[in-house]
From Swiss-Prot:
Post-translational modification (record): Ubiquitinated by PRKN, promoting proteasomal degradation.
Induction info: By irradiation and dexamethasone.
Swiss-Prot/TrEMBL keywords: Apoptosis, DNA-binding, Metal-binding, Nucleus, Ubl conjugation, Zinc, Zinc-finger
Gene from which the chain derives: Pdcd2
Domain of life: Eukaryota
Name under which the protein is recorded: Programmed cell death protein 2
A GO BP annotation: apoptotic process
Binding site for Zn(2+) 1: C134, C137, C154, H158
Record carries keyword Repeat: no
Subcellular location field: Nucleus
Pfam families given in the database record: PDCD2_C, zf-MYND
Molecular function terms, GO-annotated: DNA binding; enzyme binding; zinc ion binding
Zinc-finger ranges (MYND-type): 134-171
Function: May be a DNA-binding protein with a regulatory function. May play an important role in cell death and/or in regulation of cell proliferation.
Length: 343
């Protein structure tokens, strides 16, 4: 009988990085800032990147570079996750997949240079394809300032925001607009996501250590009380303890990647069943690919806008076939699980 080959889990951590490492031509995995789009054409439009609840533009949360070995059409492959920054709408989540063959219209056939360019370069507001990007969020921008004809936006909301934060004064200085992009307090802080393989031995060892500590703390407790405690231990407690033991060795992990594995849940409530995960538009089933951990919230500084972006787990499910539908961006599925409040 052939040995079962375990599927490795890659853990993601945030790390400061020079700006050049987070640009499209470096194929980054990253948090925050503007999206480093993969295909530089056929980007998702404003309608696809609007909150289904409030209609406001979604903010770019993170992207994961996840090529599929042995799949020529997915030699380059990235997943882009967006969320709503409004306090009542942080369930407004959307995720998109994009993939390209090694030989494509946008990037060199050879690997990118490891030497960085100057980090003083201006914000990229127009792609090589000619598509304009929003000055506020870096997404596709079909709207244009009617006065200067040089500033582009994804929505009326972002045009108004930019006008209030300086474009009103800079509008007549169109030659310098690329160098005059203010901080709109809309983007999340930008970090590179670096990965390492999870040590499969760790969680069991930690769990046994935790168990020993618990046993030690229960010395002298009457047997009747122990029986009562055991009866009241809920499935919820068990799942949360399993979650804690799983991440104990690497508590700073903000992402877990493992295509086709099972996610780890933080709560016994709101765990999706197979019927809850819609099939891909191509007809194939979707499988789990990665999850965003609550630890990422510590790095987002979401409170600076007075908002309350929050989650327990964000689990991303993608087409099992990773179907190729041209160079466009295919929407996938994200499941949000909140942290259950204990009484």
């Amino acid at each position: 009988m052939a040995a079962v080959v375990p599927v490795t889990v890659e853990l993601g951590f945030v790390e400061e990085a020079p700006a050049w490492r987070l640009r499209s031509e470096q194929f980054p995995s990253k948090v925050g800032g503007r999206p480093a789009w993969l295909a530089l054409a056929e980007l998702p439009g404003p309608g696809a990147l609007a909150c289904a609840r409030c209609g406001r533009p979604l903010a770019f949360l993170l992207q994961v570079y996840a090529p599929l070995p042995g799949r020529d059409e997915a030699f380059h492959r990235s997943l882009f996750l967006f969320c709503c920054r409004e306090p009542l709408c942080c369930a407004g989540l959307r995720v998109f997949r994009n993939q390209l063959p090694r030989k494509n219209a946008f990037y060199s056939y050879e690997p990118p240079s490891e030497t960085g360019a100057s980090d003083t370069e201006c914000v990229c507001l127009q792609l090589k394809s000619g598509a304009h990007l929003c000055r506020v969020c870096g997404c596709l921008a079909p709207m244009t300032c009617s006065r200067c004809k040089q500033a582009h936006y994804c929505s009326k909301e972002h045009q108004t925001l930019d006008w209030q934060l300086g474009h009103k004064q800079a509008c007549t200085q169109s030659d310098h607009l690329d160098h005059m992009v203010p901080d709109h307090n809309f983007l999340f802080p930008e970090f590179e996501i670096v990965t390492e393989t999870e040590d499969e031995i760790g969680p069991e060892v930690v769990e046994m250590e935790d168990y020993s500590e618990v046993i030690g703390s229960m010395e002298g407790v009457p047997e009747e009380e122990l029986d009562s405690m055991a009866k009241h231990e809920s499935k919820e407690d068990h799942i949360f303890q399993k979650f804690k033991s799983k991440i104990a060795l690497e508590p700073e992990q903000i992402l877990r990647y493992g295509r086709g594995i099972k996610p780890i849940w933080i709560s016994g409530e709101n765990i999706p069943q197979e019927k809850d995960i819609p099939d891909c538009s191509c007809g194939a089933k979707r499988i789990f690919e990665f999850q965003v951990m609550p630890q990422l919230l510590n790095h987002l500084k979401a409170d600076r806008l007075g908002t309350s972006v929050d989650w327990g787990i964000l689990a991303v499910f993608t087409c099992a076939e990773s179907c190729s539908l041209g160079i466009g961006y295919t929407e996938e599925f994200v499941w949000k699980q909140d942290v259950t409040e204990t009484p």
